[in-house]
Amino acid sequence: MSKIIGIDLGTTNSAVAVLEGGEPKIITNPDGGRTTPSVVSFKNGESQVGDVAKRQAITNPDTIISIKSHMGEAGYKVTADGKDYTPQEISAMILQYIKGYAEDYLGEKVEKAVITVPAYFNDAQRQATKDAGKIAGLEVERIINEPTAAALAYGLDKLDKDEKILVYDLGGGTFDVSILELGDGVFEVLSTNGDTHLGGDDFDNKIIDYLAAQFKADNGIDLKDDKLALQRLKDAAESAKKTLSSANEAQIDLPFIASGDQGPLHLQTSLSRAKFNELTADLIKKAEQPVLNALKDAGLSFSDIDEVILNGGSTRIPAVQESVKKLTGKEPNHSINPDEAVALGAAVQGGVITGDVKDVVLLDVTPLSLGIETMGGVFTKLIDRNTTIPTSKSQVFSTAADNQPAVDIHVLQGERSMAADNKTLGRFQLSDIPAAKRGVPQIEVTFDIDRNGIVSVSAKDLGTQKEQKITIQAAGGLSEEEIEQMMNDAKANEEADAKKKEAVDTRNEADQLIFSTEATLEEAGDKLSDDDKKATQEALEALKKAKEDAAAEDADLTDLKAKTEALAKAAQELAMKLYQQAAPKEGAEGEAKPKG
């Protein structure tokens, strides 16, 4: 069975790992990084992903960051380089880039992946993630929750231990808490909670707001109104936040950030860790309640927890670590790299699927309750949150009026009592119900949740056995046709990118050959006759002309390749002549003189 890679598709950064020799290993990107910025930029019809995209974020307005925070959002699109893109398409570009460098590392095609999502992602967000994988040309074998993946990475070498662990996962854009029980190779999620709109970006924004307010008070100019200045502020805020994880003060120096009546203005200030803690105190406080909720749902107290695992880059913030320690009464475990653990755990799950990892069983849960709208707009739950998945649950309902010919099934996800306060996953109708008094027809509604947390719902008239089924596709979700089209577009871009790379390689090869041949001719000097050098010189000039003719981006490179090949052959013959010309001389110098 081919390798299944594990991908942590993050808000700020992404990572990929693979199982080698029974151990998960991070695959580095072409820049040598162990994580890749989840950034996509567009320019002149071309897209770039990762570090190169992030580096131009300041100067290129068509740069997209933190797209994960919009996954599953109905109707959401971003416009870049004159074209609209869904979050699934942008995420697919990141996945395609990751897939590409994973293939380069493995030396084989990668077609399957385990992709992680925040534990508190709803059905629409999970489906959007799966669609992104499909667009990128990946068969998504499993969607698993990020804290669960981190627990797999932590517990792989502790299969003989019985532990209850709390995973505190604060990433770039999302926050999750999961409580798991580990024992005899079984990783059982007892509960999960979180906030899909709380993460490192929010900490950055607190610094941005503070710096912008300070600058406005001093100079009367709002830097947030200037896109370029705002991007510079964002970069400075992120850098300051990272500095304050290990230092008590961060210097912020942004020259020529704006222009005033007296000329250019500069932002030069410092930010202390104490001030940063003050600015972000409400965010850290906000993260406490999900921890308490998860503990309550698991039926445990803090004294029952054996280990507290920190995951996600934002857990490097000292105030976050201090808050976790104070709340749980335990020193957090730092044995796993918070930036890499999720990808490593996803690779372990990939190994479980292929059979390369034995004796590991993962039992995950659904993060939110599922049900339907019933009379009076009430939300009737069929599956409670924190139910182990996969699972199935049925309940019989009836009609609300006499001779009702059809029932509308309104599928919801959430914890509120009234349907209107919960998240709509989808709607469908069961029709042709025989005329009868209200309450007589028996309509059985069944919910199925698969291992990926994807929901299917069916409704059956028990009298006629007529049945209607849907796999939930939330508003704003993609149809199969749209996914197919996006897959074709992605493939076309992949082929176009490959052609561009081939063109660059061809031109580089020609350049290198011209340079090395000129050096060889110079070295030959008077050692060879003009006749000996003639063929090489002619081939050299021919290649130079072919290179000029093929300078246009869309030029046909056939002639350039042929002339490169011709010069390579001529240069080889020239080198051979040089070698032969030098050989007898070296032999003569090396001969021993007879004794006289």
From Swiss-Prot:
<dbReference type="InterPro" id="IPR012725">
    <property type="entry name" value="Chaperone_DnaK"/>
</dbReference>
<keyword id="KW-0067">ATP-binding</keyword>
<comment type="function">
    <text>Acts as a chaperone.</text>
</comment>
<dbReference type="InterPro" id="IPR029048">
    <property type="entry name" value="HSP70_C_sf"/>
</dbReference>
<dbReference type="InterPro" id="IPR018181">
    <property type="entry name" value="Heat_shock_70_CS"/>
</dbReference>
<dbReference type="InterPro" id="IPR029047">
    <property type="entry name" value="HSP70_peptide-bd_sf"/>
</dbReference>
<dbReference type="GO" id="GO:0005524">
    <property type="term" value="F:ATP binding"/>
</dbReference>
<dbReference type="GO" id="GO:0051082">
    <property type="term" value="F:unfolded protein binding"/>
</dbReference>
<comment type="similarity">
    <text>Belongs to the heat shock protein 70 family.</text>
</comment>
<keyword id="KW-0346">Stress response</keyword>
<protein>
    <recommendedName>
        <fullName>Chaperone protein DnaK</fullName>
    </recommendedName>
</protein>
<keyword id="KW-0547">Nucleotide-binding</keyword>
<dbReference type="GO" id="GO:0140662">
    <property type="term" value="F:ATP-dependent protein folding chaperone"/>
</dbReference>
<dbReference type="Pfam" id="PF00012">
    <property type="entry name" value="HSP70"/>
</dbReference>
<keyword id="KW-0143">Chaperone</keyword>
<dbReference type="InterPro" id="IPR043129">
    <property type="entry name" value="ATPase_NBD"/>
</dbReference>
<feature type="modified residue" description="Phosphothreonine; by autocatalysis">
    <location>
        <position position="174"/>
    </location>
</feature>
<keyword id="KW-0597">Phosphoprotein</keyword>
<dbReference type="InterPro" id="IPR013126">
    <property type="entry name" value="Hsp_70_fam"/>
</dbReference>
